[in-house]
């Protein structure tokens, strides 16, 4: 859990999120005010401290709306809030009301190729991940498909916890 005291996971497949053993979940199939309320409820009494955002777009806007509440709960105990953007699967842009920036100690950061750690550290991480995979501690359920089936199976990963592997004939 990377030293986190409370972890909230957001996604469309709640069964997968709940299996992670997190403290709270947010259903990203919700929209508008319902999604904002879900993020507010999931924050708990300490609010959010670090947010790792893989999708950007409407879900991020809903989360940010919970920070625009003009009370001390959004200060994460005086430590501030860090929003780390890792991807933009839902949308490339968001609307960011200026009031969100003025009403709390929010830092917005990006994590991409320009933010990679030094090569020796990356090698250590890769070694640790491969060791976990070799012992079976890191598993991913997969389903194999022929390249000819790609049009039919393209969206399967959106509806299932099983990852598709496309077989390419040699």
Go through the PLM ranges and name each one.
Residues 4, 20, 78, 101-103, ...:
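Short, well-ordered coil/turn elements that cap or connect secondary structure elements
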Residues 24-106:
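Glycine-rich cofactor phosphate-binding loops and adjacent beta1-alpha1 units
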Residues 10, 86, 111:
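The conserved SAM/SAH-binding core of class I Rossmann-like methyltransferase domains
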Residues 16-19, 62, 152:
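Phosphate- and divalent-cation-binding pockets in alpha/beta enzyme and binding domains
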Residues 71-72, 117-170:
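C-terminal hydrophobic helical "lid"/dimerization subdomain
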């Amino acid at each position: 859990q990377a030293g986190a005291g409370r972890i909230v996971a957001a996604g469309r497949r709640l069964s997968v999120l709940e299996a992670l053993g997190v403290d709270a979940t947010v259903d990203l199939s919700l929209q508008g005010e319902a999604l904002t309320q879900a993020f507010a409820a999931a924050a708990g009494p300490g609010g959010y401290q670090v947010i790792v955002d893989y999708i950007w777009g409407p879900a991020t806007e809903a989360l940010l709306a919970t920070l625009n509440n003009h009370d001390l709960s959004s200060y994460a105990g005086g430590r501030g809030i860090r929003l780390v953007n890792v991807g933009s699967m839902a949308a490339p842009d968001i609307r960011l009301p200026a009031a969100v920036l003025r009403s709390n100690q929010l830092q917005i950061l990006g994590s991409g190729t320009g933010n990679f750690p030094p090569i020796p550290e990356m090698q250590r991480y890769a070694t640790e991940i491969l060791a976990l995979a070799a012992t079976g501690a890191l598993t991913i359920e997969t389903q194999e498909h022929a390249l000819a089936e790609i049009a039919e199976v393209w969206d399967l990963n959106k509806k299932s916890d099983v990852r598709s592997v496309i077989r390419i004939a040699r």
